[in-house]
C-alpha cells in the first residue's frame, strides 16, 4: 500500500538540506519487542544507520535513522506500529578528547537547547558521529558550521555506508 498523504510527500521531498529524518517508534516494553521490530526492517531490506532506545515502565521509544525513511514509515504503519518522523541533525566531530565538549559549548553558548543526542558508527577513520535533536535546527546548523563542526545531510550519510 502506497501512502498518498500530502504531509508525507512534503516531508519526504528529496531536497538537499542539512537534516536527516529520524523515525521514532513506540515499542511495548517486553522481551523480544526490539527483535521483532528489527526483523521487520530486515525483511523489507531496510538498513539501519543509527538506533537509540529509551524505555519507561510500559513502553520504549526506539529512534532510528534508516537508508530509506519513506518506505520504512509506510512499512511500520502497515505493521501497526505507532511512529512519527522528526528532522534531526547528524554531525561529524573529530574523534579526540574535547571534541564533544567543544560542540556542546558552541550550542550552549549560543542558547541552542539540546533535547537529546546519540552516537552512531560510520566507515570513516578519526571521526565520531552524533545525532542531535535540538529546539531550532536552523540556528543549530548555523552555530555548528561557524564552529567548524560539519552537519551531515542524508545523502552524505548514505555515502559513508558504501
Give the positions of each predicted feature.
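A conserved regulatory-domain signal marking ACT and ACT-like small-molecule sensing domains
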Residues: 11-162
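Targeting/processing segments of secretory and organellar proteins
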Residues: 1-2
Amino acid at each position: 500500500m502506497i501512502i498518498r498523504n500530502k504531509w508525507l510527500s512534503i516531508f519526504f521531498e528529496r531536497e538537499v538540506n542539512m537534516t536527516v529524518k529520524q523515525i521514532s517508534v513506540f515499542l511495548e516494553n517486553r522481551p523480544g519487542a526490539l527483535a521483532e521490530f528489527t526483523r521487520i526492517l530486515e525483511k523489507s531490506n531496510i538498513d539501519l544507520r543509527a538506533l537509540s532506545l529509551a524505555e519507561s515502565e510500559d513502553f520504549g521509544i526506539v529512534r532510528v535513522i534508516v537508508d530509506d525513511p519513506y518506505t520504512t514509515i509506510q512499512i511500520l504503519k502497515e505493521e501497526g506500529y505507532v511512529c512519527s518522523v522528526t528532522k534531526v541533525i547528524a554531525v561529524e566531530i573529530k574523534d579526540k578528547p574535547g571534541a564533544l565538549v567543544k560542540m556542546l559549548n558552541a550550542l550552549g553558548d549560543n542558547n541552542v537547547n539540546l533535547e537529546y543526542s546519540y552516537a552512531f558508527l560510520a566507515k570513516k577513520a578519526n571521526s565520531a558521529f552524533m545525532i542531535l535533536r535540538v529546539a531550532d535546527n536552523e540556528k543549530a546548523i548555523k552555530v555548528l558550521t561557524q564552529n567548524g563542526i560539519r552537519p551531515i545531510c542524508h545523502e552524505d550519510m548514505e555515502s559513508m555506508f558504501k
